[in-house]
Amino acid sequence: YSPALNKMFCQLAKTCPVYLRISSPPPPGTRVRAMAIYKKSEFMTEVVRRCPHHERCSDSSDGLAPPQHLIRVEGNLRAEYLDDRNTLRHSVVVPYEPPEVGSDCTTIHYNFMCNSSCMGGMNRRPILTIITLEDSSGNLLGRNSFEVRVCACPGRDRRTEEENFRKKEEPCPEPPPRSTKRVLSSNTSSSPPQKEDPLDGEYFTLH
C-alpha cells in the first residue's frame, strides 16, 4: 500500500488484508461492503468485472463467489456476493466484527481475481475499491476508498508510480541566466534579456 498515492498494489488472487478503524461501535447487524468502480468518469457507469479468460478459469475453489466477481473475501463463510438491481455493480458484504482483543482495527482479507491489464476486463483502466459500513437497513454509516492495481510486480510498480508522482509535484527549476555577448556602440542601446518565469509545478490532490 502506498500512502502517498492512496493506492494498493497486489498480485492476482493473493491475500490483501484491509484494516477498518471506526470511531465508535456500530449498531447490531452492521455490515461491511466492498465494491470496485472505475476511477475515470468516462468509465464510471461500466461494471468492473473479471476478464473472460479468468471467468472461464474458475473452479470449485471459488466457493460462494460468482465467477464474474472481481473482489472476494477470504476465509469468511458469511460473505454474500451481490449484484445491484439498478446499476448491476458487483459487491461483497460481510457482517461487521469488532476488533480482536489488543487491536483497534477489524481485519478483512480480500482477493482481487483479475489483473488490471487483462483485455476484456479492466484493460488497464484504474479502479477504486469503495469500502462502506452499513446498518441492517442499508443506511450508510461510514465510507472510504483507495485505488487498486493488480499486477505481477507490485513492489516495482509502486516504486515507479511513487517516483513519477514526486516528479509531478516538484516545480520545474528556474533556468540559469543566459550569458550574452554585446557589441558596445555609441549610438545603440540594448535592453537586458527578459527573465523567464519558472514553470508552475503540477499538484494533485488525492481523495
UniProtKB/Swiss-Prot annotation:
Positions of region (Oligomerization): 201-207
Post-translational modification N6-lactoyllysine, affected residues: K14
Chain positions found as Phosphothreonine: T160
Protein name as annotated: Cellular tumor antigen p53
Biological source species: Equus asinus (Donkey)
Composition skew (Basic and acidic residues), residue ranges: 159-171
Pfam families per the UniProt record, alphabetical: P53 (PF00870)
Annotated function: Multifunctional transcription factor that induces cell cycle arrest, DNA repair or apoptosis upon binding to its target DNA sequence. Acts as a tumor suppressor in many tumor types; induces growth arrest or apoptosis depending on the physiological circumstances and cell type. Negatively regulates cell division by controlling expression of a set of genes required for this process. One of the activated genes is an inhibitor of cyclin-dependent kinases. Apoptosis induction seems to be mediated either by stimulation of BAX and FAS antigen expression, or by repression of Bcl-2 expression.
Residues where Zn(2+) binds: C51, H54, C114, C118
Similarity annotation: Belongs to the p53 family.
The UniProt record lists the keyword Mitochondrion: yes
